[in-house]
Each structure stands twice: as structure tokens, then as C-alpha cells.
């Protein structure tokens, strides 16, 4: 009986515990999505949110960008996207097998198939031979629209030409379709356009964006002002102003000579200490004594005329004092009278001169008359002045210099002097086109203004060349030279531009060469040695080369670059 009562008590306790279960171990119901049983209670599972009674929706954090949430933090991406949150573009063109037969171009969230010329794109992405497209002979392929063949252009900046086959460029700058930001100008390109900073501005990243910033040409040394001028930076450019004492446009400043005009009339200078009088209002200046000697210094030879004007004879009285006392001389007829003081006689070197009339001594004062006029013919040319000996100073004729001055010294005295310059706007300036060359240098019009030289197109197969020669003549003894020129070698298979020098007989190896690039460039080459007879530009082209070789602004200066 006691055992039975214990069993009943234990079973009642078990039932009470089961009734108080809080649902900590939920069990998902198989027949429902996102529903779980928490003991005797049914609710949404973890990672699901209740939308309506009996329906639960999964929760994804972060949300799916290009897809839908199918489970807790589980996204199903739309076609063309990938990634955990479907935020990445899927490159279908890189999949295997490739989705396109000929050409594939990936786009955001999708892709496009293109066919080669002569083929037509089918709806399934494959390409099929289209006789109509081949007959259309489109420049960039074709498309069939409503049973009609239509040529296509690959860029929105291109449009079909009137012939319906080729594509021509749309000048967005001229039509006004686009507007560039401040301080930029629109530059049209084939199929598009660019906004380029104006001249004097540079594109810089400022304040989180790209802006055209003014270039300080003065501080960067990118100006053409003369060395005797000041450079002032202005917005988008600069200006030059000659310094005090110089005049010009700022690019070329010439020294203004200072002319000092003296009063008319000769200047009388006494041999010893005295005063110098200029005209009626002269200023008295004392001539200092020469050292400790009592005798006047020997006057050096000078070109002005020296006039000896004797004074009256002073009488000498027989007194114990050996020094005679001369009488003051009468005033000369000149408007200004120099004061002269006769020297007392000494035992070592008396200043009196005996005369044939009487044994009395007399003193003679020499008055120096200086002419302040400029002498037309110098007595002797200076040794550091270079004098052309020819009647005409032609550039390529004989140019002699003063004897005793070598070419090296001439370069040191005047380095960087321009001896030749040519921009080919008015001819070849002494350059010679070799007639035996296969090709020839021809002048071409520069869109920016002026002319430049270019190599003609090759018409025969094989290597062809055009040579342009400048003979230096006697300038080859000028020492080192600096050759400066602008050039361009642009386009597909443009050819080669080279520089040679001829010293003895034929020219040697090329000093410089270029076979490609983009746009105009500036180059300087130092021609070493004093035996360079000629400078040669050689442009090579082959048949079928569509590029261009250009040459402009050639100059030669003394000294190294």
C-alpha cells in the first residue's frame, strides 16, 4: 500500500513539471516554412519575422541588393549579379562556355553579343552568316531591324554618313551638346570629346575634385621674358616688363645708353698742383702730390694736344738767398686763367733754364689742353672685340675674328649666341633637300599657324628616306654647338626621324632618333667638336605607313645645351 502511494505521488510531480515547460528547445514543424514549436506554443523560427498569422518571412542583414532573401542571411541573386548580398556584377563573358559565339561585351547586370562583319546576330546570341550584311559592306557591322539591314556605329558620338555605310564623327563642341566646366575648353575627339584646361592652367585635384588651377610661369621658369626683364604672373598667362635702364617689349630688352654732355670748350690742366676750370663756372680740384718727391710726375702720352705757353721772365737779384723770386705772369688771353706756381731751384735739380739772351733763369709752365670730343678713329683696336672683316656680315660666309682670340675663347666670351634659326614659314633658310633622296621634305600648313616640314608618302616598296642638310661652312670652327628643334612622329607605322652630323666624308652613326610617340616634342642635342661640317635630318618611311614625320623651329646656338 505504501509503495502504491509513492508511485502515485511521483507521477503527479512529473506531470506538473511537464506542464510548466518554457519552450527552450523548439522543434520546427516540417509542414510549415519558418515555423517552430516551442513546447505547447508555435511561433516563427530564429532568423524569421512574422508577417501575418501563420506566415513567417526570412530576415537578411544586410539586405539583398539585386536579389531576394530566401533564408536567414541567405540571398538568391538575380541573373547577372553575384556576391553574398548580390551587389557585384557578374561577368558573363568570362564564363565557360562563353555565352556569345563571336564577341561578348559585359554590361552592368547583363552582357551583349556582337558578330563579326558579314554575320547577323540571332535572338539566342549566336551569329549567322547574313548575305545582306556582307552586301551592305558596313564599316562597323550591321543589324537587321524589321527585316531591313541597317549599319551600326559603335559610339553615340558617331553617326551614319549619307552613304549609309560609314560612320562620321559628331562634333559635340561645335553643336553645343556639351558644356565644359570653368577654365576648360571642349576638344572634340573621334566618337567623343574631352574638356581640356585652357592654356596657362593645369588640372589639379583640389578640395575633393579636379579643377583647372593657374600655372605660375614666373616661379616655375616657364616664361620667355628677357633676362633684363621682370616677369609678372597674371590669371592664365604672364607678362614681361623691362627693368629700369632697358627698353623693349619684355621679351627682348635693349640697354638704354646714358649720354653725359660736358660743357663746350677745352679744359686747361696745369702740370702741377692747381685748379681745373670748365668754361665760366669751373670747380676747383686740387691735384694731389705724387708721393714724397718734390718734382712733378712725368706726364704720360695722351692724344689731346699739349700746348706750351711760356710765362714772362722773372728777374733774379743777387741776394744771399739762392732761391729767385719770379714775378707773377701776365694773364693769358683765355677766359679762364689757371694759377701756376713756379718751382724753387734746388742744388740737385734746378728748375731754371738758361737762355741765350741773358744768364738770368726763367721758369716755363706747361698747360695741358684736353679735348673732350669723342675720337672717331681709335689708336688701337681692343683685343677682346671681334671685328667682322667682310663688307657684309652674311651668316654662312667667312667670319674672321681678331688675331690671337681662338674659337674656344669666343664661345666663352659670348656663350649661347644664336647663329641660325628657321621656322620654315618663309622658306628653308639655307637648308638643302638632297635631290638623290628617295623621298623629299615638303612644307605643310600648321593648324596653329605657320608651316612645318613633313616627309612625303612612299610610293614604291622598300625603305625610303628623305634628307635635309645644313652646311655650316666656316662656322664649323665655332666649337660646340647646341641644336634645338621641334618634331613629331605620330600615327600607325609612322617611320623614323634621325639626326646625323658630317665631319670627314660621309656621316657616322645617328646621334638621335625617334620612331613613335604622340604630338609635338622639343629636343636639344649638343654637337661636340669644332670640325662639324654639316647637320643632317633623315626621315625614313616605308610604303603603306600612314603616320606623319614633322620638323619645325630648328635653331643653332654656340656652346653646349
Curated annotation (Swiss-Prot):
Expressed in kidney (at protein level). Disruption phenotype: Mice display renal agenesis at birth due to a developmental delay. This delay is associated with a reduced expression of Gdnf and is similar to the one found in mice lacking Itga8. It is found in: Secreted, Extracellular space, Extracellular matrix. Homodimer and homotrimer. Was named nephronectin based on its potential role in kidney development. InterPro entries: ConA-like_dom_sf (IPR013320), EGF-like_Ca-bd_dom (IPR001881), EGF-like_dom (IPR000742), EGF-type_Asp/Asn_hydroxyl_site (IPR000152), EGF_Ca-bd_CS (IPR018097), Growth_fac_rcpt_cys_sf (IPR009030), MAM_dom (IPR000998), Nephronectin_domain (IPR052235). GO terms for biological process: branching involved in ureteric bud morphogenesis; cell-cell adhesion mediated by integrin; cell-matrix adhesion; cellular response to tumor necrosis factor; establishment of protein localization; extracellular matrix organization; pilomotor reflex; positive regulation of cell-substrate adhesion. The keyword Acyltransferase does not apply. The MAM domain is required for localization at the cell surface. It comes from the Eukaryota. Residues 420-561 form the MAM domain. This is Nephronectin. Coiled coil: none annotated. PROSITE patterns: ASX_HYDROXYL, EGF_1, EGF_2, EGF_3, EGF_CA, MAM_2. Residues 307-316, 352-366 have a biased composition (Low complexity). PANTHER family: NEPHRONECTIN (PTHR24050:SF19), PA14 DOMAIN-CONTAINING PROTEIN (PTHR24050). Functional ligand of integrin alpha-8/beta-1 in kidney development. Regulates the expression of GDNF with integrin alpha-8/beta-1 which is essential for kidney development. May also play a role in the development and function of various tissues, regulating cell adhesion, spreading and survival through the binding of several integrins. Residues 317-348 have a biased composition (Pro residues). Keywords: Calcium, Cell adhesion, Developmental protein, Differentiation, Disulfide bond, EGF-like domain, Extracellular matrix, Repeat, Secreted, Signal. The gene is Npnt. Residues 52-87, 89-128, 132-168, 169-213, 214-254 form the EGF-like domain. Residues 266-370 are annotated as: Disordered. It comes from Mus musculus. Belongs to the nephronectin family. Residues 1-19 form the signal peptide. It holds the Pfam family MAM.
Amino acid at each position: 500500500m505504501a509503495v502504491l502511494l509513492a508511485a502515485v505521488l511521483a507521477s503527479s510531480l512529473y506531470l506538473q513539471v511537464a506542464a510548466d515547460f518554457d519552450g527552450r528547445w523548439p522543434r520546427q514543424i516540417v509542414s510549415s516554412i519558418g515555423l517552430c514549436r516551442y513546447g505547447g506554443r508555435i511561433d516563427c523560427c530564429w532568423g524569421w519575422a512574422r508577417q501575418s498569422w501563420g506566415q513567417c518571412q526570412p530576415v537578411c542583414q544586410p539586405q539583398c541588393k539585386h536579389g531576394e532573401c530566401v533564408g536567414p542571411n541567405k540571398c538568391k541573386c538575380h541573373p547577372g549579379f553575384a556576391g553574398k548580398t548580390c551587389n557585384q556584377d557578374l561577368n558573363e563573358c568570362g564564363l565557360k562556355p562563353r555565352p556569345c559565339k563571336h564577341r561578348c561585351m559585359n554590361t552592368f547586370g547583363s552582357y551583349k553579343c556582337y558578330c563579326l562583319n558579314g554575320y547577323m546576330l540571332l535572338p539566342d546570341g549566336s551569329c549567322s552568316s547574313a548575305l545582306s550584311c556582307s552586301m551592305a559592306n558596313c564599316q562597323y557591322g550591321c543589324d537587321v531591324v524589321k527585316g531591313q539591314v541597317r549599319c551600326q556605329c559603335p559610339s553615340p558620338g558617331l553617326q551614319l554618313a549619307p552613304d549609309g555605310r560609314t560612320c562620321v564623327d559628331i562634333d559635340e563642341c561645335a553643336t553645343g551638346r556639351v558644356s565644359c566646366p570653368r577654365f576648360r575648353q571642349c576638344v572634340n575627339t573621334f566618337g567623343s570629346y574631352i574638356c581640356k584646361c585652357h592654356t596657362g592652367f593645369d588640372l589639379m585635384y583640389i578640395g575633393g575634385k579636379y579643377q583647372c588651377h593657374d600655372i605660375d610661369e614666373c616661379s616655375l621658369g616657364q616664361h620667355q621674358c628677357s633676362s633684363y626683364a621682370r616677369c609678372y604672373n597674371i590669371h592664365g598667362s604672364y607678362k614681361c616688363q623691362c627693368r629700369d635702364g632697358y627698353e623693349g617689349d619684355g621679351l627682348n630688352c635693349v640697354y638704354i645708353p646714358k649720354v653725359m654732355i660736358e660743357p663746350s670748350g677745352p679744359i686747361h690742366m696745369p702740370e702741377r698742383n692747381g685748379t681745373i676750370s670748365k668754361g665760366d663756372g669751373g670747380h676747383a680740384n686740387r691735384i694731389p702730390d705724387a708721393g714724397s718727391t718734390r718734382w712733378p710726375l712725368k706726364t704720360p702720352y695722351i692724344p689731346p694736344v699739349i700746348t706750351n705757353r711760356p710765362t714772362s721772365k722773372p728777374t733774379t737779384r743777387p741776394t744771399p738767398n739762392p732761391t729767385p723770386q719770379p714775378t707773377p705772369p701776365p694773364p693769358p688771353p683765355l677766359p679762364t686763367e689757371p694759377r701756376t706756381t713756379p718751382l724753387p731751384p734746388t742744388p740737385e735739380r734746378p728748375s731754371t733754364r738758361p737762355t741765350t739772351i741773358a744768364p738770368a733763369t726763367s721758369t716755363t709752365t706747361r698747360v695741358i689742353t684736353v679735348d673732350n670730343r669723342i675720337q672717331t678713329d681709335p689708336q688701337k683696336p681692343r683685343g677682346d672685340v671681334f671685328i667682322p672683316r667682310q663688307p657684309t656680315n652674311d651668316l654662312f660666309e667667312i667670319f674672321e675674328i681678331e688675331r690671337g682670340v681662338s674659337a674656344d675663347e669666343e664661345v666663352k666670351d659670348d656663350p649661347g649666341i644664336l647663329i641660325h634659326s628657321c621656322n620654315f614659314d618663309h622658306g628653308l633658310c639655307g637648308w638643302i633637300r638632297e635631290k638623290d633622296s628617295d623621298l623629299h621634305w615638303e612644307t605643310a600648313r600648321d593648324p596653329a599657324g605657320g608651316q612645318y616640314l613633313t616627309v612625303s608618302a612612299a610610293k614604291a616598296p622598300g625603305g625610303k628616306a628623305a634628307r635635309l642638310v645644313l652646311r655650316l661652312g666656316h662656322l664649323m670652327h665655332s666649337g660646340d654647338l647646341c641644336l634645338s628643334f621641334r618634331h613629331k612622329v605620330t600615327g600607325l607605322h609612322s617611320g623614323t626621324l634621325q639626326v646625323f652630323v658630317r665631319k670627314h666624308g660621309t656621316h657616322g652613326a645617328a646621334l638621335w632618333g625617334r620612331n613613335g610617340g604622340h604630338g609635338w616634342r622639343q629636343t636639344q642635342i649638343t654637337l661636340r667638336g669644332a670640325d662639324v661640317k654639316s647637320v643632317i635630318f633623315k626621315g625614313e618611311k616605308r610604303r603603306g605607313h600612314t603616320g606623319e614625320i614633322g620638323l619645325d623651329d630648328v635653331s643653332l646656338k654656340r656652346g653646349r645645351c
